[in-house]
Curated annotation (Swiss-Prot):
Signal peptide range: 1-21
Entries under Pfam families matching the protein: Lectin_legB
GO function term, MF aspect, one: carbohydrate binding
Function: This metalloglycoprotein, containing Ca(2+), Mn(2+), binds glycoconjugates containing terminal non-reducing alpha-D-GalNAc residues.
Entries under InterPro entries matching the protein: ConA-like_dom_sf, L-lectin, Lectin_LegA_CS, Lectin_legB_Mn/Ca_BS, Legume_lectin_dom, Leguminous_Lectin
UniProt-annotated glycosylation sites, renumbered to this chain: 53, 82, 100, 129, 205
Protein name (record): Lectin
Family membership: Belongs to the leguminous lectin family.
PANTHER family: CONCANAVALIN A-LIKE LECTIN FAMILY PROTEIN (PTHR32401), LECTIN (PTHR32401:SF45)
PROSITE patterns, sorted: LECTIN_LEGUME_ALPHA (PS00308), LECTIN_LEGUME_BETA (PS00307)
Source species of the chain: Phaseolus lunatus (Lima bean)
Keywords noted in UniProt: Calcium, Glycoprotein, Lectin, Manganese, Signal
Amino acid sequence: MASSVLLVLSLFLVLLLTQASAELFFNFQTFNAANLILQGNAVSSKGHLLLTNVTHNGEPSVASSGRALYSAPIQIRDSTGNASSTPTSHSYTLQQIFQNVTDDPAWLFALVPVDSQPKKKGRLLGLFNKSENDINALTVAVEFDTCHNLDWDKNSIAVNLGIGSVPWNFRDYDGQNADVLITYDSSTKFLAVSLFYPITGKRNNVSANVELEKVLDDWVSVGFSATSGAYETHDVLSSSFASKLSSLDECPTGENLLNKIL
């Protein structure tokens, strides 16, 4: 078996807006299943969030897929159509076993429809049902793709927005901490991602114009999705999220904070 490597990522997402008054905040330094919607192979173990399966030897399982969402719906835009301001931060651990793979491993921070179910595994990342533009997905995600697939990936290992990507040579930064800053400015509709390695000072950037209010429902679920092709494991160590709106509407009928494990 080839050697394994470890990457710890701290992800900071900031969606910036000029108007903000109603606020929502949560902070998980450890994870409790009672506060989460766990789907597919995702589990909470010893305070960590494990998105994909591992074998009894601690190696990644083939074709594993999992999603973990905060159990309360999040209002992403108000009744006037304004998008929200949402700063959030997360820390991750990825462990890779380098070998031949049949599916693309990747992990994502995602905004998905409330009560949505996991979609197809592998290259569709548990978020989509088809490879073409899936207009029914109503999903926005930032993908960290640690496997280069010649058929699908135009660049090397990459940070992707779906509508743009930047090469990310994961193997050059084995075991290093990385900080990710994601910002959305609703006045300019500009979404930007910056991946920074403090030890080396190396930074990668990708950006795109996205009208979140035209892509997402008023209410969304916030969380993570990951897939594995016998290549890597995906652990979330901590997470915090805040949302600010000019006004806060009533939560959709029938939605609550109860845990759902699927």
